[in-house]
């Protein structure tokens, strides 16, 4: 074979190899591209899988109060509590230590986690009185908080009104049932709301 013939054959082989390489790269890019697509955002927000729903305002964002309590229960279990004070972005509560029922501890839930506990001094209180104050954190209708806030704001129409607190507790013998007490601060006046533990509205007062 002449030198020219060998050169033409070499060029033909190189071109064919290059074409095969392009085809292979094209195929790999197709598969790689499909696997690199971001997974659909999970916004289910179930108790087992909170998903990616933003925290929101615990007092006014629908579902935010319940998600906060669900997160607390996931960390500590369905504790019995003496009170729960819920603010716009954090929750403070006192709970009985199930391993040592005579001990009451104070916790703060903030930024998606429960912080370390602080021991509560119960000197002078009988164990039976402590037990009478306790209720299960899961027996309250936390899903009603945002709706109560909406009603609270609508019925009071306070100038600059802002719901600042939802406090849940019982106070036997004067208040034997679990109750939700909410507070609103306004520019010129304040207001309060009372509801049953199941979320049933009982009273709104402007003062």
Give a label for each model feature.
Residues 159-207:
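Extracellularly exposed regions in secreted/surface proteins, prominently low-complexity, repeat-rich
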Residues 26-29:
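Bacterial signal peptide processing site
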Residues 111-134, 191-207:
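A short, surface-exposed interaction/processing loop segment used at functional sites
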Residues 1-15:
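Bacterial N-terminal signal peptides that target proteins for export
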Residues 31-103:
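Extracytoplasmic low-complexity, Pro/Thr/Ser/Ala/Gly-rich segments
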Residues 20-24:
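C-terminal motif of bacterial Sec signal peptides marking the signal peptidase cleavage site
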Residues 115-161:
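Long, charged/polar, surface-exposed segments that mediate recognition or autoinhibition
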Residues 84-105, 167-186:
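Short glycine/threonine-rich beta-strand-turn micro-motifs
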